[in-house]
């Protein structure tokens, strides 16, 4: 490995990587990093100014550490005002919901549907009860085997008894 003095045209040959370029780029990278930090701090300062509503004389005296401390306090206030359902530490490790929780999660969206269907279900149940009452009333009032409905040939008695009753009805006429 040959070593040269670092100048604009001289390069140390070490696998095609220039040590001189790395050394020269380091201050430039540091300058860019500091510029990003200062830009972010000024943005934080503007956010805090809008939130704090303090006069501009005090704003110019804020140090970088003050800005960071106030930003942390501000974020903590926001977090306490609006608690998250899952904290970052528990979001990756989640336990499966219990059956009661699953049922609760299912019931909540079904409540509007149930309130919509409830009157219709009540009407349907009332209709079924009326139909049963009507059928029982007909059976109670017609024990002799008279057809339950005019359009149906169904009788309450055996077919032999029904035939016998038909013959008796014809003889009366």
Swiss-Prot record:
Changing residue 30 to K: In n372; alters cell fate specification within the V5 lineage, and also causes anterior V cells to generate V5-like lineages, including ectopic formation of neuronal structures called postdeirids. GO terms for biological process: anterior/posterior pattern specification; epidermal cell fate specification; negative regulation of gene expression; nematode male tail tip morphogenesis; regulation of neurogenesis. Residues 21-78 form the bHLH domain. One of its GO terms (molecular function) is DNA-binding transcription factor activity, RNA polymerase II-specific. Expressed mostly in the seam (stem) cells and hypodermis (hyp7), but also to a lesser extent in the intestine. Residues 83-102 are annotated as: Disordered. Disruption phenotype: RNAi-mediated knockdown leads to an increase in seam (stem) cell number variability. Residues 35-78 are annotated as: Helix-loop-helix motif. Residues 83-95 have a biased composition (Low complexity). It is found in: Nucleus. GO terms for cellular component: nucleus. The keyword Transcription regulation applies. Pfam families: HLH. It comes from the Eukaryota. Keywords: DNA-binding, Nucleus, Transcription, Transcription regulation. Residues 21-34 are annotated as: Basic motif. Probable transcription factor. During development, required for cell fate specification, probably by promoting or repressing expression of genes involved in specific cell fate. Involved in specifying lineages derived from the epidermal stem cells of the lateral ectoderm, known as seam cells. Modulates symmetric divisions of seam cells, perhaps in concert with the Wnt signaling pathway. May repress expression of homeobox genes mab-5, egl-5 and lin-39. PANTHER family: BASIC HELIX-LOOP-HELIX TRANSCRIPTION FACTOR, HES-RELATED. This is Helix-loop-helix protein lin-22. It comes from Caenorhabditis elegans. The lineage of its organism: Eukaryota, Metazoa, Ecdysozoa, Nematoda, Chromadorea. The gene is lin-22.
């Amino acid at each position: 490995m040959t070593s040269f003095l670092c100048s604009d045209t001289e390069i140390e040959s070490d696998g095609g990587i220039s040590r001189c370029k790395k050394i020269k780029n380091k201050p430039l990278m540091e300058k860019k990093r500091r510029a990003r930090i200062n830009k972010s701090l000024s943005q934080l300062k503007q956010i805090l100014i809008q939130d704090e509503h303090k006069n501009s004389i005090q704003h110019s005296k804020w140090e970088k550490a003050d800005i960071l401390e106030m930003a942390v306090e501000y974020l903590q206030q926001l977090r306490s005002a609006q608690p998250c359902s899952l904290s970052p530490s528990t979001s990756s490790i989640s336990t499966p919901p219990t059956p009661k929780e699953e049922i609760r999660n299912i019931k909540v969206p079904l409540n509007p549907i149930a309130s919509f269907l409830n009157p219709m279900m009540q009407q349907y149940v009332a209709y079924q009860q009326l139909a049963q009452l009507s059928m029982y009333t007909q059976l109670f009032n017609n024990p002799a085997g008279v057809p339950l409905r005019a359009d149906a040939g169904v009788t309450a008695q055996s077919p032999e008894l029904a035939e016998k009753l038909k013959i008796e009805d014809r003889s009366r006429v």
